[in-house]
């Protein structure tokens, strides 16, 4: 089974179990060293604690065992964790919550010969992102159509 199919199956199975105040941010599955790792990224307002991740792990693990047929080709380690400072912005809702924050955006197609922008998200209306970024020493604004965004995440401003 392809890794993207595993991620889709896992996401569909665990989403109903991750309820308010928690938010499912992302699911990743892949090899880390010699082991397969299923990473479930979860967050909540004010941040997630170690106890939260332990409780969610106990809730999620039995759900994964009910997926039939078993989508995992090999044994894997389950990791329930915080998305960290550079959390991915995978949905339009996540992008909307990031208005006013410093973000990193990769595009499918270039705008003004650039495919990567890093700056402050000024607004998002569901269709277009408006960002302010530094071009050498000058501040510039760019309008990015949402459908051209390949990846977006929060970024740490240095």
Curated annotation (Swiss-Prot):
UniProt main location, coarse: cytoplasm
GO cellular component terms attached to this protein's record: cytosol
BP GO annotations: ribosomal small subunit assembly; translation
Keywords, sorted A to Z: Cytoplasm, Ribosome biogenesis
Compartments, record wording: Cytoplasm
InterPro entries: Ribosome_maturation_RimP, RimP_C, RimP_C_sf, RimP_N, RimP_N_sf
UniProt KW Cytoplasm keyword: yes
Family classification: Belongs to the RimP family.
Function of the protein: Required for maturation of 30S ribosomal subunits.
Name of the protein described by the UniProt record: Ribosome maturation factor RimP
Name of the gene encoding the protein in the UniProt record: rimP
